[in-house]
Amino acid sequence: MLLHLIYGPTCSGKTDMAIQIAQETGWPVVALDRVQCCPQIATGSGRPLESELQSTRRIYLDSRPLTEGILDAESAHRRLIFEVDWRKSEEGLILEGGSISLLNCMAKSPFWRSGFQWHVKRLRLGDSDAFLTRAKQRVAEMFAIREDRPSLLEELAELWNYPAARPILEDIDGYRCAIRFARKHDLAISQLPNIDAGRHVELIEAIANEYLEHALSQERDFPQWPEDGAGQPVCPVTLTRIR
């Protein structure tokens, strides 16, 4: 079985690349993302719309209400192993995402050391200014009012009605920044979807900068695998960490 691993920081184009390869190969994509396992925060977690998937298959490691909490890394890794093992008779599978903890679980596990051929592609952060331009565009899209999905701010306003969800939201990029923004400006969370244009731009910039901080931590803490078709990228002999 060929495993095509695509990993990199947020806003680096991983999902678009995975969809393109899925279109070319017909293989499903398994999302290496713990936050995307909560459909109630589909927009803020970056889950692609059905229309964006272009008839390709995307597999999430769980589907749970946010009040149950974010799936922990070890549980996500067990579910990933199950998905891959169950599909071992297939020609290939695409693994795509940027969960630091899940990728490091993979790096430590003997499961990935044999029985697979690998193609590994790592996307890089690159220039910070270019990243912020992409991140601002992405956040603006998350703020857009759409018929097929609530905006990030609408998701936040709805979920804020559930006290059990609040500490979880305060620990997720984007939502955390919006909550702090509301407190700074003495706004109720329910007011955020209707803020004026000036504050809208200010919040977009703030979230983009939070994404940059997260991307820098991803670049620092990701495991590093040999790229371009290495046979066993997670073997301890070849695995290193970026420091």
UniProtKB/Swiss-Prot annotation:
Xref: Gene3D superfamilies: Crystal structure of tRNA isopentenylpyrophosphate transferase (bh2366) domain (1.10.287.890), P-loop containing nucleotide triphosphate hydrolases (3.40.50.300)
Catalytic activity: dimethylallyl diphosphate + AMP = N(6)-(dimethylallyl)adenosine 5'-phosphate + diphosphate
Superkingdom of this protein's organism: Bacteria
Any one biological process term the GO annotation gives: cytokinin biosynthetic process
GO MF, one example: AMP dimethylallyltransferase activity
Keywords noted in UniProt: Crown gall tumor, Cytokinin biosynthesis, Plasmid, Transferase
Enzyme Commission identifier(s): 2.5.1.27
InterPro entries assigned to the protein according to its UniProt record, in alphabetical order: P-loop_NTPase (IPR027417), Tzs (IPR002648)
Function (record text): Transfers dimethylallyl groups to AMP as part of the biosynthesis of cytokinin phytohormones.
Protein name: Adenylate dimethylallyltransferase
Organism from which the protein derives: Agrobacterium fabrum (strain C58 / ATCC 33970) (Agrobacterium tumefaciens (strain C58))
